[in-house]
Every structure is written in structure tokens, then in C-alpha cells.
Amino acid sequence: MTSLYALIRPLLFRLDAERAHDLTAKALRVTSRAPLLPRLIRALYAWEDPLLAVDWSGLHFANPVGVAAGFDKRADLVDGLALLGFGHIEVGTVTPRPQPGNPRPRLFRLPEDTALINRLGFNSPGMVAVARALRARRSRDVIVGVNIGKNRDTPLERAVEDYVATFVALAPIADYVAVNISSPNTPGLRRLHERAALETLLHELTRLNRALPHPRPIALKVSPDETPDQLEAVVRAGCDAGIAAFIATNTTLARDDLHSRLAIETGGLSGRPLTQRARQVIGAIYRLTHGAPPVIGVGGIATAEDAYQHIRAGARLIQIYTGMVYAGPAIARDIKQGLARRLRRDGFTSLEEAVGVMVAA
């Protein structure tokens, strides 16, 4: 049966990609606040199965399917996204001070490749506005992470100050914090992958975290464009600092085998072209860490099979952004149902039993 989104999508795709996103965000906000609608939306989308539950660093996830950072930069869509059945929502990237990001147009669909290119550039309302939005949210049964970054005009040698400021402001009201050093759209940011800079940043954040009354899990979001040696150095630095997870991966600068005329646009590529590379990075990290700390897999997930193969490669949790643009609001439900079928088919009694089996084999 044709879904409602399949009928609406051609209309949305006639709009500029960011304009369509803004309309979607508005619809989510309205839906979450309207009388009776939240109950109806939950009935349609909030399917759960105990087989899919995941525990990580003291947090209990009803299911492994989350929303990747970038979809909700203002932290004002949490209530709406929670209605769609996601197990966690990562808001941001959040910078200390408000900044507009790069000039529009800065978000592009590549339908021939089931992909997006973005050069948003950390457009953010700033940490004060995000803190206000997080305190105002109604949904308390969904895990909320905060992805943090630096302001564009902050010199790289002072980047630690930006991460510290945002961490101090937001960690106490988030369930976990993700450190974004891998966006390709902030000049020089990926230089923080260099071991000395990364060690300084992570050790300062973990020091501050230990001083909190209730320390939060810290995850490190990594680039898909590192060489094997560079990736290993990043993983070693993260492990030495005691981070709680790696998020693999961010968007890529690679442009391999694309068919869309918009492939020439600058920015980070996400979606189907990233699927295999993200899975390779997930597997590489899992081999290095043996799953401790775990991997949160993101990149090119649009179906239950995509999610299952990321999990088999080593991901304990997964995140979606581009897949939702193409598949619509039922994507979390559809992936969860497909995952449960695959886990039972293959004889697993929990999702966590399937994590990394492809690597272990």
C-alpha cells in the first residue's frame, strides 16, 4: 500500500531542501503540541519489542534506532520525534554562541544517489537557547544526547574553550554528550583529529565530567575520511581518555560513483553512498576496541537490512538522518520491525548478541 509520505514526498522535493526541512520541523512541533494528535501518532509509529532494548553506560534505550545530529539543531523537535518511535535523539551540533552557519543554499538532495550534501556550517541558536529548549521538553521517556562543536570564528588553538563552555552548559540537562570534531563544514575542525589536540580536548572534558554530580557518557564522533592509521590513533586517544562510545561516522568529502548533477556541490555527503564506508569504519573500530567502548553506527541507513548489517559490523546503536528524508516518518517503526524479524530468524535472543558477529567471525 502506498504510504502517505510517498504521496507527499514529490511535493516536498519540489521545494528547496532546507525549506522542506523547515516545514517538516514546523509540522513536528505542531503535532507534538496539538490535542489528541500525539496519541494518534504514537499509535501509528511507536512499535516496540523487548528484543531490541539496549543498555549503554547506565542508560536504557527502548530500541537502538536514533535520530542523528543535524536534524534537530535547536532541540525543539524532541517531543515530535519521540512520537515517531525513536529510541534516542541527538540534538545539535550546538555551539557556545549563536551563529547563522554558511549562506544558503547549503543543503542539497541527490535523489539519483539517495543522498544529501550539506554545508550548513554549524548553524546554531547557541547553548543558552538549546538549554532552554531541553528544559521545556515534555518527552522524558526518550534518551536525548547533545552534540557539541566550536564557533566558526573561534581560533583552533582556543577550540577547547568552546567545547568546555558548551559541555558545562548542557551536560547536566542531557543524557549524553557527543563531541563533534569531524564535520567537514567548519574550516580546520578536522585538525582536532590530530592526537595531541584530541588528547588535550578529551582529557579536559572527561576531567570536567568526573566533577559533575552525575557524570554523563561522552561519545566521540569520527570522520569516515581518515586513513587506517589515523583512525587507530583517534580510537586510541578516545580509549585512553575514557570516552563512553564512538559515533561512526560523520559525512564524507568523497564523491565516488555519484550520478546527480548536484554531486559537484561542496560539503559533506550522507546517505546511500556512505553505507559501505560507514560500515567499514564501524568494523575497524570494533576490531580495535572489541566493543568496549561501543560504537554508535550512522551513515547510509535507510532499511532494516542496512541497520542489521551495521549492528553485525559492531554498532550497538544506530542513527538516521538522510534515510528519514527519503523514507519518511515511518522509518523507525519499519526498521525496528525488520530488525526484530532478522534477529529471531538468526536465533538471537537479544540485539546485543548480534553486535559485532560479522567481525568476530
UniProtKB/Swiss-Prot annotation:
Keywords assigned: Cell membrane, Flavoprotein, FMN, Membrane, Oxidoreductase, Pyrimidine biosynthesis
Keyword Flavoprotein among UniProt keywords: yes
Membrane protein topology class: Peripheral membrane protein
Reactions it catalyzes: (S)-dihydroorotate + a quinone = orotate + a quinol
Highest taxon in the source lineage: Bacteria
EC class of the enzyme, as a word: oxidoreductase
Active site: 183
GO molecular function per UniProt: dihydroorotate dehydrogenase (quinone) activity
Residues binding substrate: 73, 118-122, 180, 185, 250-251
Subunit structure: Monomer.
Protein name as annotated: Dihydroorotate dehydrogenase (quinone)
Origin species: Roseiflexus sp. (strain RS-1)
